[in-house]
């Protein structure tokens, strides 16, 4: 069977605090490492989705409703459900990597990077389905 957990693939988080949220694989580790001897992936996802906007709303209200809260986390493959979709959101690999979990300041920076890139993509109007809450 081919490897399908690749960077850019959209996954659904199944377990934990962010379960039911959509995320994108930033880096996948199929063979595991010494500290995590199982296949896992570094993902960046959306914690709080942007709210619905209409034409009648003003600029300020639209700006407020278009905010996104993101998360960066390492997940076991068992806790991720891959979808057939992929998005090409260019996250900076020097900022968003596995080393960010050692230092809270770096983690904040990585989360900020993901937030900025997600909001940028949301404002262009591409990948609309990615920025909508999963209805379940």
Swiss-Prot record:
GO terms for molecular function: RNA binding; structural constituent of ribosome. GO terms for biological process: cytoplasmic translation; rRNA processing; translation. The modification N6-acetyllysine is found at residues 27, 93. It is found in: Cytoplasm, Cytosol; Cytoplasm; Rough endoplasmic reticulum. Keywords: Acetylation, Cytoplasm, Diamond-Blackfan anemia, Endoplasmic reticulum, Ribonucleoprotein, Ribosomal protein. It comes from the Eukaryota. CDD domains: KOW_RPL27. InterPro entries: KOW, Ribosomal_eL27, Ribosomal_eL27_CS, Ribosomal_eL27_KOW, Ribosomal_eL27_sf, Translation_prot_SH3-like_sf. GO terms for cellular component: cytoplasm; cytoplasmic side of rough endoplasmic reticulum membrane; cytosol; cytosolic large ribosomal subunit; cytosolic ribosome; extracellular exosome; focal adhesion; membrane. Residues 5-40 form the KOW domain. Component of the large ribosomal subunit. Interacts with RRP1B. Interacts with DHX33. Belongs to the eukaryotic ribosomal protein eL27 family. Component of the large ribosomal subunit. Required for proper rRNA processing and maturation of 28S and 5.8S rRNAs. It is linked to Diamond-Blackfan anemia 16: A form of Diamond-Blackfan anemia, a congenital non-regenerative hypoplastic anemia that usually presents early in infancy. Diamond-Blackfan anemia is characterized by a moderate to severe macrocytic anemia, erythroblastopenia, and an increased risk of malignancy. 30 to 40% of Diamond-Blackfan anemia patients present with short stature and congenital anomalies, the most frequent being craniofacial (Pierre-Robin syndrome and cleft palate), thumb and urogenital anomalies. This is Large ribosomal subunit protein eL27. It comes from Homo sapiens.
């Amino acid at each position: 069977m081919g490897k399908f957990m690749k960077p850019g693939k959209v996954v659904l988080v199944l377990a934990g605090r962010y379960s039911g949220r959509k995320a994108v694989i930033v880096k996948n580790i199929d063979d595991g490492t010494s500290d995590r001897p199982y296949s896992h992936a570094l993902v960046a996802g959306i914690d709080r989705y942007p709210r619905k906007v209409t034409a009648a709303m003003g600029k300020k209200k639209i700006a407020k409703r278009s905010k996104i809260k993101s998360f960066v986390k390492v997940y076991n493959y068992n806790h991720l459900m891959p979808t057939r979709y992929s998005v090409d959101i260019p996250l900076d690999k020097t900022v968003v990597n596995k080393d960010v979990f050692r230092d809270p300041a770096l983690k904040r920076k990585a989360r900020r990077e993901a937030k900025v890139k997600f909001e940028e993509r949301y404002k262009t109007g591409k990948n609309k389905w990615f920025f909508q809450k999963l209805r379940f």
